[in-house]
Swiss-Prot record:
Organism of this sequence: Chloroflexus aurantiacus (strain ATCC 29366 / DSM 635 / J-10-fl)
UniProt gene name: ctaB
Ranges where the record places region Protoheme IX prenyltransferase: 318-587
Enzyme class, broadest EC rank: transferase
Protein name as annotated: Protoheme IX farnesyltransferase
Superkingdom of origin: Bacteria
Amino acid sequence: MAARSLMRILLVGLGLTLATIISGALVTISASATVCSSWPLCLEELVQSQNPLVWISLLHRLFVALALLAVFAGLVAVWRSSDTAGLPRITAGIAAAFFLLQALAGALLVWGVPAMVADVWHLSGALLAFGAQSLTIALIAVPTPATPERLAGRAAQMQRRLRSLAWWSAAAAGVAALAIGARSVVPGFGMMTAVPTNSVSAVGFAALLSVWMALEARRRLRPVAETPALALALPRYSLFLPALALLALLGAFIPVAGHLISLTAIALLWAATIIAAVILQRVPFSFATATAGVRSQPAWRTVVADYISLTKPKVISLLLVTTLTTMFITEAGLPSWWLVIWTMIGGYLAAGGAGAINCAFDSDIDINMGRTSRRPVPSGRISRRAAFIFGLILSVLSIIVLWVFTTPLAAFFALLGIIYYAWFYTGWLKRSTWQNIIIGGGAGAIPPLVGWTAVTGSVSLMAVVLFAIIFYWTPPHFWALALVKQKDYARAGVPMLPVVAGEAETRWQILVYSAIMVAVSLLPVAIGAMSWIYLIGAVVLGLRFMRDAWAVWRVGDQAAIWGLYKYSLLYLALVFAAMVADRLIIG
C-alpha cells in the first residue's frame, strides 16, 4: 500500500476516535447515556420518543462504529505495508485493542454492569487508543534515520535533555487526559461540576512541561541539511503546545462546557506532544549551546541560575513527584487545589534548602569529582557561607509554609528530612561508612510522609510502606551511579560501596536490594490499601527492574549499569503513578 494512502487511513481513524471522545463527553454532560436501554441501537426509543437526547446518544454510537472500523482498517493496512515492520505494528494493535475494550465497556454500561468500572474503561479506553494511534502515525511519518547523527559535548547533552523533556511532556499529557476522563467516577464530582482538583493538578503539570518543552525547542533547535520537511516546522509548531495546555487548564474552571473544552484540548495536546517526542527522538537537528552565541548571559541571570542550581532541581523533581502522588492516595480523599500548591511550594523549599546546605558542606568533595566540580560553590562563583545562608533561609521558609498552610506534622517531617540529609548524611554519614547510601536512603524517603501528613494530619501504615519503598529503592539506584563514578568517589575519599568492597560485591548488593524493593512494593496490596490495578503495575514494573538488576550482576558492563540507573528513575515515578490510578479508578 502506498505511504500516502496508509497515512490517510490512519488520520481518518485518529479523527474519528477524537470525535468519539468528544461525543462521549457530550453524552455525559447532557445525561443522555441512559435514554437508550438497548445496544448497539435504540430504535424503539427513537421511534417512540421525541427526546433530542436520543439523537445525541445515537450520534456517539455512530462515531464509535465508524471509528472502530477505521481503527481496524488502519491495523490491517499497517500490517500489510512492507514499510511499517516493527514498532508501528505493535502500537496499531494496541490502539485497536483499547478501542475494542472501550466499545465493549459502553455495551456493559447499557447492560447494567457496575457503572464505575465500565464508565472508566469506556472513556479511558478511547483516550488510550487515541494516544496509541498518534504514536503509530508519528512512527510511520518520521522513520528512523539510516545514519543517526553524532553529537558530542554540550550539544549532545542538550539533545538528551530535550528528548527526555519531550517524552515526559507526552506522559504528563496522557496522565492529565486520563485524569479528566476519570473524573465522572470520582465520588462527589459529577460531570455537571467543574473539573476536580486531581484533574486540575494533572493538567497544570502537563501544561508546565509542555510550555517548557516548547520554549526549549524554539531556543535550542537548529535544522541541518538532513532535517526532513515535516520536522522543519517543529520550532514554530511547538508554539501551539502552550495554547492547547492553557485551553485545557482554563476549561477546568468552566462548569459543564469546561469539561468538553478540557478533554478536547488535553487529547490534542497528548497527540501533539507524542508527535513532537518522536520527531525529537528520530530527526537530526543541531542544538544551539550557551557558547555558540556571540552574546554573553547577563551577570544577574548567571547569579540567579547558580542559586537555583544549588537547590538541585533535577533531584527535587522526583521528590516532588512522590510527594504529589502520595497526596492523592490517602484515605482522606482528594486534596484541595490550594493544599496541593502550598505543599509543593513547601516541599520544593525544604528539598532545595537541604540541597543548598549540602552544596556548602560538600564543596571539598565536589571539587575533586568531574560530575560536581563545576557546581557554583567548588568553582568559586558562590561562597560556602552564601550557599549555607541561602539553604538555611529556604529551609526556614519551608517550615513556615508547611506549618501555616498544611499541617504541623507535615512541617515536622520536612524539618526531619532537612536535618537528616543536610547534617546527618552530608556532614557525617557520607564520609564515614560504606553504608551511607543504605542509611541515608531515609532522607529521600521522607517526601511521601510530607505529602501524606499534609492531607491527613496523621501517619498510617500505608505511609510507612511508601517510606519503605523509596528506602529500599535508594541503594540500587545510587550504587549504579557509584559504579559508574567510582573513580571520582575514590579520588574524593568518599567510602562508597564500589570503592570499599569492589564492583562484584556492589553488583550483588544491587540485585539483593532490588529484590527486597520489589517485594516491598507489593505490600500496599497485602495491607488492603491498593487493588489489582496497582498489583499489575507493580509486578510488571518490578519484573523489568529485576531484569535490569540481573543484567548488572551477571554482565556488569556500563550499558547494563546505566540502563538500571535510568530505568530506576522512571520506575519510582511509575509505581507511584500506578497507585494514583488505582485510587482514582477503584477508590
